[in-house]
Regions:
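Hydrophobic alpha-helical bundle segments that form small-molecule/ligand-binding pockets
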Residues: 119-143, 147, 151-174, 197, ...
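Alpha-helical structural segments
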Residues: 16-24, 59-75, 84-91, 118, ...
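N-terminal intrinsically disordered/low-complexity leader segments
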Residues: 1-13, 73, 183-192
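A structured, mid-to-C-terminal "fold-capping" secondary-structure block
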Residues: 165-219
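Hydrophobic alpha-helical connector segments
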Residues: 73-118, 134-137
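Basic, helix-initiating cap at the start of DNA-binding domains
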Residues: 1-29, 33-38, 42-45, 54-62
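Residues in the recognition helix of alpha-helical DNA-binding motifs
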Residues: 53-54, 140
């Protein structure tokens, strides 16, 4: 097959297509391994061609983070603040699970995009309209997002979270242990982790509800 001319590929490129490719590449290899050259290769173009559409790698990452924020549902206006924030947090966890590289970057950008700013404004509005003071809004937002991002980061880095993979991992760890060693770990693994239906991800909503209940009591 005759290669397409570089000019044709360049005409097909756009900022949106560059960001599409960047998101797909980061989902595949992670953001640490992400480079402009690898992105150019994935888009079948040359690195310098990308700079016709984005000024820098930082600008690409800014756009990627903004896209993740766009995937997160904002707190529904028709709900009270507590169920609205619960809905938003579950949506955030789902978006971060789709993009495991994103959690450490979500609050790192010095040039946040419109989706990022709009999301933060919507969350602050939800908490304030729910009757929380400015001080309690600050406490609530910091606590909630520390939990959401922390859980997402932990979940993304676990070697297994459920099913046969978790059973195989747990067995490989506990089987070589000397008899009688680590009794609490052994009990927890045998009677909880290795039970049918165990899913580490199910812990997310339990912890989230504890946080929201506590905030409601203090609001």
């Amino acid at each position: 097959m005759t290669p397409r001319p570089a000019t044709t590929r360049k005409q097909r490129l756009s900022t949106e297509r560059v960001l599409d490719g960047a998101m797909a590449l980061a989902d595949e290899i992670g953001v640490d391994a992400f480079t402009i050259r690898k992105l150019a290769d994935a888009l079948e173009t040359k690195p310098m061609t990308l700079y016709h559409h984005v000024p820098s790698k930082d600008a690409i990452v800014d756009g990627m983070v903004d896209r993740v924020f766009a995937e997160i549902d904002r707190p529904p206006l028709e709900l009270d603040w507590k169920p609205a924030m619960r809905h938003r947090c579950i949506s955030a966890r789902e978006a971060l699970a789709r993009h495991p590289w994103a959690a450490p970057l979500m609050e790192s950008r010095t040039s946040p995009g419109p989706e990022t700013l709009g999301h933060h404004d919507a969350v602050l509005g939800c908490l304030r309209q729910g009757g929380l003071s400015l001080e309690m809004t600050a406490h609530a937002y910091a606590l909630i997002d520390s939990y959401v991002y922390g859980f997402a980061l932990q979940e993304a880095n676990l070697p297994a979270t459920s099913g046969d993979d978790m059973a195989e991992l747990a067995t490989s760890i506990i089987d070589p242990a000397p008899e009688g060693a680590y009794p609490h770990l052994m009990e927890f693994t045998a009677q909880h982790v290795l039970q049918h239906g165990f899913d580490f991800g199910a812990e997310f909503e339990f912890g989230l509800d504890l946080i929201l209940d506590a905030l409601e009591d203090r609001a």
